[in-house]
Structures are given as C-alpha cells and as structure tokens.
C-alpha cells in the first residue's frame, strides 16, 4: 500500500507485483480511512499486501497515481503512465468500466445508456452497483454517470465531491443538482466512443 497526500487529504494506492494499480481510494481526511477504502475496493487478494511502501516500484507507481490525481484536480488532463489490474473483475464490470472510461471530459451519460451499450438495457441498477465498486475512481470516471433525469445520482465520495469533479471538467450543474442537457451523451454517441477508444486495461 502506498499512501500519498494532496493538501490535507490522503490517497491510498494498492499495487501488485507486476507494478499494476489494483485499487485506490478517493482523497480522504485520514490515512486509515484511505487505506481501508483502497483495500475494500481491491477485486483480488494481494499475497504481499503488507509489504513495505518503501519498495522502489511501489513508491514510484504510487507517486505516479497521486500525481495523476493532483493534476486532474488542478483542471489538467493527465495521461496514464501506469497500468491497471482488472484480473479480479467480472466480465460485466470490465465492460461497464471500459465504456465509462470512454466518456470524454466535459460530458456525462446515464446508467441506462451504459447498460444499453454493454448489451443489457435492463441492467441500469447493475451498472450502478458496478460503478459503486469502481477500483479506480477519477481514473475511470464513474462520476460522469448520472441518472436519466440528469440529477447526479449516487457517488461513493458524496454528491458534493461528484459536483466538484464535474465542475472541474466544465460540466454545468444547476443549484438543484441537475446537469445541463448540453453535456449529455446519448447511447448512440457513447457506443461510438466506446468502440473507438483505447482500452484503459
């Protein structure tokens, strides 16, 4: 486990022996909460999970992840310099996260649209459950998925953080918590983007 700090918040990152990111926490107020969250989101058991964060590759990859999040929170568009380990995810969850990774900055879509693109239009709730367990928040932008009526829906980090992340990306959110329709991606556009995007894992 690598723990980094952004301002007064902690981010915990779990890294496997192949230098891939297994899971990470959202920025949290305490180191313990961040570590517990990252561990709870890990889809696989790490045989060496108590290995020292001072191992050179853990330190290097952990710093890269924290720098990615830091750049993102500054409004920049950082590029992935590390790999994600999706080994423990179900095929459905992989499909959901892959589709969500193709949603461009400045846009949102809804749970129902994601369900249709992955091939099961009745699976909106299952999509929501998969996103609630997203091992790589912010990196795989589950905050860009909202309800069909364009209200924000849920978010593990709370709705205020979801609103903040969307605003960083230039998405207009009304005081009542609804995204403006100009930012919405239809099923058709989402399908095209997901087919043409480079896979994150």
Residue ranges with predicted function:
Residues 122-160, 173:
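Short glycine/serine-rich loop segments
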Residues 86-87, 159-161:
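Non-transmembrane, interaction-prone segments in cytosolic or luminal domains
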Residues 1-121, 168, 172-201:
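Basic nucleic-acid-binding alpha-helical/helix-turn surface characteristic of O6-alkylguanine DNA
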């Amino acid at each position: 486990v690598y723990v980094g700090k952004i301002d007064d918040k902690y981010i915990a990152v779990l890294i496997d022996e192949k230098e891939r990111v297994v899971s990470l926490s959202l920025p949290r107020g305490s180191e313990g909460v961040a570590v517990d969250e990252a561990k709870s989101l890990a889809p696989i058991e790490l045989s060496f999970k108590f290995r020292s964060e001072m191992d050179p590759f853990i330190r290097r990859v952990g710093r890269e992840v924290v720098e990615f999040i830091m750049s993102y929170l500054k409004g920049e568009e950082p590029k992935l310099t590390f790999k994600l380990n999706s080994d423990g995810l179900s095929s459905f969850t992989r499909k959901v996260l892959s589709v969500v990774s193709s949603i461009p900055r400045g846009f949102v879509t809804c749970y129902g649209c994601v369900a249709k693109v992955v091939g099961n239009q009745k699976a909106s709730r299952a999509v929501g459950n998969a996103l609630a367990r997203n091992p790589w928040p912010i990196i795989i932008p589950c905050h860009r998925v909202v309800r069909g009526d364009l209200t924000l829906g849920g978010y593990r980090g709370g709705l205020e953080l979801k609103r903040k992340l969307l605003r960083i990306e230039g998405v207009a959110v009304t005081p009542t918590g609804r995204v403006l329709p100009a930012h919405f991606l239809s099923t058709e556009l989402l399908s095209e983007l997901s087919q043409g995007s480079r896979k994150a894992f």
